[in-house]
Structure formats: C-alpha cells, structure tokens
C-alpha cells in the first residue's frame, strides 16, 4: 500500500524520474511552452513553480539552488533574465496546463504546459 506517499512515480525509477523532470524543466524554460502527456505536465508543474519562486530573487544562493535543479547553465541564465522582471510581483501561478486531447498512437492524454 502506498498510503501517505506523495508524488507521481510515472512508472520510472528515481534516477529516471529525476532526469525526466530536469529535462522537462529545461525545455519549458527554453521554449516557454511544451507539449507532453497530462501526467508528466501535472508532475513537473510544482517543480517549475518552486524553481521560478527561487529565481524571483537574483542572489548567488538562488542561482546555485536553481543550477542544482536544472544542471544547465544556459537554462539557469535564461531563467534569471526573465523571472525577476516577469514574475516579480506575482505570488505563484506561473504555469498553465491546457488539455489537448488524446494522442493518436496510444491514446495518452496530451497537455500543453506553458509559462504565463
């Protein structure tokens, strides 16, 4: 029984899931919106929200924390160029998930996750 175990496993090991979240976050920061499955979008949304909340204050410590989550200096730089100005006065709610319907090949529910 998985009582009181928060978070989605997505049928992956811990390392695989961590790499998936990192890649989705980097893609979302670079492209502002990505098309993925609904389960992946819902799983990565809190991670992205927390990352943007960290990036709102541009301090060396915040940059180190963001880099530890992203592992991409280019994505970290891009995040810190737009996050303080765009989301400075906003407390949460930085992303939006829009359902797109089922995928043709396997019927997986697709979604668009985008930065507001």
Curated annotation (Swiss-Prot):
UniProt-listed GO biological process terms: translation
InterPro entries: Ribosomal_bL17, Ribosomal_bL17_sf
An example Gene Ontology molecular-function term: structural constituent of ribosome
Cellular component annotations (GO), alphabetically ordered: cytosolic large ribosomal subunit
Superkingdom of origin organism: Bacteria
Alphabetically ordered keywords of this record: Ribonucleoprotein, Ribosomal protein
UniProt similarity note: Belongs to the bacterial ribosomal protein bL17 family.
Assembly description: Part of the 50S ribosomal subunit. Contacts protein L32.
PANTHER family: LARGE RIBOSOMAL SUBUNIT PROTEIN BL17M, RIBOSOMAL PROTEIN L17
Protein name, per record: Large ribosomal subunit protein bL17
Origin organism lineage: Bacteria, Bacillati, Chloroflexota, Chloroflexia, Chloroflexales
